[in-house]
Regions:
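Conserved N-lobe ATP-binding subsite of Hanks-type protein kinase domains
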Residues: 96
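C-terminal lobe helix-coil module of Hanks-type protein kinase domains
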Residues: 165, 194-195, 199, 209-216, ...
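Short N-terminal regulatory/linker segments that flank and modulate the kinase catalytic core
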Residues: 1-87, 111, 180, 241, ...
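A short, aromatic-enriched beta-strand patch in the conserved N-lobe beta-sheet
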Residues: 148-150
Length: 352
């Protein structure tokens, strides 16, 4: 028996879940559905309980359905286009990652291939192809490039990513006692990459330490840019994303609530990452506390208006200038001026 279309189930569930039970049944009866889809949707709606948001309930009800999807479509040695799969490097909520190498004889190239979970409908596959074109144009020294993409013989989308050498951000920081200045420089590299992507109208939506690699020279590379966007079933009229994939602990409140999100969601995630990078010792500084607080406000409108402004405040802190997040009056600004000019001020005082 054919499985119900996953993308359509998502759409129908979202339409019906907030209706009263009687209206749900009436709408369900009026829909032109095959028996399997109707029964699957009815089970999902019947299991809906509690006060969670529609998006949260959707994730919970779809999880059981997703578990039944065959994950054995591809294996080491399989060929996807011009790429031959190597060993599996890992598996996560979004799919499995394989090492890969190019085998068409044009030139030698190593890559990482992420095979995404699920089998989208033809309409969703068309959206995925369009989104891949956008992501493939992201060219920044701190963003891992999207090289290629397609679908497996059984219809699962895959992405071919630049292979990046380095350690996860959290592992990199735990293995070496980096001073504050170097930690902030790493963070500013991340901000530069995210700001660049935002200028191309691409939001990451899943920024976290495991998606940030640091090489032996202290250079940052952001992974999985736009993967959450690719997994989304659609985009709103104004181009902002209604995302459904996220990592608890780093996701913004609006992302967790299933609301429409934009650049402010990435600002929030960067604020959480900055807090973790600084640890208890460095984050006690009042200016840094203010920066983190501003970036992680619950209300997106009260955060930094852009990642660029967040990075700018970090830059001001590094050089002893007042930070926007503090606001502050003449006393605060005066104290920062004295810090910047301390040697000269101290010298003058000796002669007064």
């Amino acid at each position: 028996m054919a499985r119900p279309d996953l993308a359509r189930l998502k759409s129908l569930f979202t339409q019906l879940v907030d209706l009263p039970s009687r209206e749900q049944e009436a709408e369900l009866a009026a829909l032109s559905l095959d028996r399997e889809t109707r029964e699957q949707l009815r089970r999902m709606l019947a299991a809906d309980v509690g006060e969670a948001s529609a998006a949260t309930r959707l994730r919970e009800q779809m999880s059981e359905f997703r578990e039944g999807i065959d994950e054995s479509d591809v294996a080491e040695g399989d060929q996807l286009g011009v790429w031959q799969l190597g060993p599996m490097l890992g598996r996560g909520g979004m799919g499995a990652v394989f090492a890969a190498r190019r085998t068409d004889g044009q030139f030698k190239q190593e890559a990482a291939i992420k095979v995404l979970q699920g089998r989208p409908s033809p309409q969703a596959l068309a959206l995925l192809a369009a989104e891949r074109q956008i992501l493939a144009r992201l060219a920044h020294p701190h963003i891992a490039r999207l090289l290629d993409g397609g679908s497996t013989p059984k219809g699962r989308p895959y992405l071919v990513m630049e292979q990046v050498q380095g350690k996860r951000l959290d592992q990199y920081l735990s293995r070496r006692p980096l001073p504050l200045e170097q930690r902030l420089l790493l963070f500013q590299q991340m901000c530069a990459a995210v700001a660049y992507a935002h200028a191309q109208l691409v939001v990451h939506c899943d920024l976290k330490p495991s998606n940030i690699l640091v090489d032996q020279d202290g250079q940052v590379s952001l992974l999985d840019f736009g993967i959450a966007r690719l997994l989304d079933a659609g985009i709103s009229d104004d181009g902002s994303q209604v995302a459904k994939a996220y990592t608890p602990g780093y996701a913004s409140p609006e992302l967790q609530n299933g609301d429409t999100v934009g650049a402010a969601s990435d600002v929030y995630s960067l604020g959480i990452i900055l807090k973790e990078m600084l640890g208890q010792t460095f984050s006690r500084n009042a200016d840094l506390q203010a920066i983190i607080t501003r970036a992680t406000r619950t209300d997106p409108a009260k955060r930094y208006e852009s990642v660029t402004l967040l990075a700018q405040d970090v830059e001001h802190f590094r050089h002893g200038y007042p930070v926007r997040a503090r606001g502050g009056g003449w006393l605060y600004r005066g104290s920062r001026m004295l810090r910047r000019r301390w040697p000269a001020s101290a010298g003058v005082s000796l002669f007064l």
